[in-house]
Each structure stands twice: as C-alpha cells, then as structure tokens.
C-alpha cells in the first residue's frame, strides 16, 4: 500500500470505473431503444 500518486492500482480502479459507467450507458441506450420500439 504505497502512497505513490502514480500507483497502477489506482489507475486500474479508475479505468474500471469508467468502463462500468460506459457499460451502464450502453445498457440504458439499449433498453430505451427497446421500449421506444
């Protein structure tokens, strides 16, 4: 548990967080298209 600001673990966690947000947005778009049609 180093306090290095360039810790790869923090970057990996941030990347996974952004990927999760993108995945949720894609799912919302798919469901909205499904319900509109």
UniProtKB/Swiss-Prot annotation:
<keyword id="KW-0997">Cell inner membrane</keyword>
<keyword id="KW-1133">Transmembrane helix</keyword>
<dbReference type="GO" id="GO:0005886">
    <property type="term" value="C:plasma membrane"/>
</dbReference>
<comment type="similarity">
    <text>Belongs to the PsbL family.</text>
</comment>
<dbReference type="Pfam" id="PF02419">
    <property type="entry name" value="PsbL"/>
</dbReference>
<dbReference type="GO" id="GO:0015979">
    <property type="term" value="P:photosynthesis"/>
</dbReference>
<keyword id="KW-0674">Reaction center</keyword>
<comment type="function">
    <text>One of the components of the core complex of photosystem II (PSII). PSII is a light-driven water:plastoquinone oxidoreductase that uses light energy to abstract electrons from H(2)O, generating O(2) and a proton gradient subsequently used for ATP formation. It consists of a core antenna complex that captures photons, and an electron transfer chain that converts photonic excitation into a charge separation. This subunit is found at the monomer-monomer interface and is required for correct PSII assembly and/or dimerization.</text>
</comment>
<keyword id="KW-0602">Photosynthesis</keyword>
<comment type="subunit">
    <text>PSII is composed of 1 copy each of membrane proteins PsbA, PsbB, PsbC, PsbD, PsbE, PsbF, PsbH, PsbI, PsbJ, PsbK, PsbL, PsbM, PsbT, PsbX, Psb30/Ycf12, peripheral proteins PsbO, CyanoQ (PsbQ), PsbU, PsbV and a large number of cofactors. It forms dimeric complexes.</text>
</comment>
<keyword id="KW-0812">Transmembrane</keyword>
<keyword id="KW-0604">Photosystem II</keyword>
<dbReference type="InterPro" id="IPR003372">
    <property type="entry name" value="PSII_PsbL"/>
</dbReference>
<dbReference type="InterPro" id="IPR037266">
    <property type="entry name" value="PSII_PsbL_sf"/>
</dbReference>
<protein>
    <recommendedName>
        <fullName>Photosystem II reaction center protein L</fullName>
    </recommendedName>
</protein>
<keyword id="KW-0472">Membrane</keyword>
<keyword id="KW-1003">Cell membrane</keyword>
<feature type="transmembrane region" description="Helical">
    <location>
        <begin position="16"/>
        <end position="36"/>
    </location>
</feature>
<dbReference type="GO" id="GO:0005737">
    <property type="term" value="C:cytoplasm"/>
</dbReference>
<dbReference type="GO" id="GO:0009539">
    <property type="term" value="C:photosystem II reaction center"/>
</dbReference>
């Amino acid at each position: 548990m180093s306090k290095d600001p360039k810790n790869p673990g923090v970057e990996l966690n941030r990347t996974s967080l952004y990927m999760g947000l993108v995945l949720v947005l894609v799912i919302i778009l798919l469901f909205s298209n499904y319900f509109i049609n």
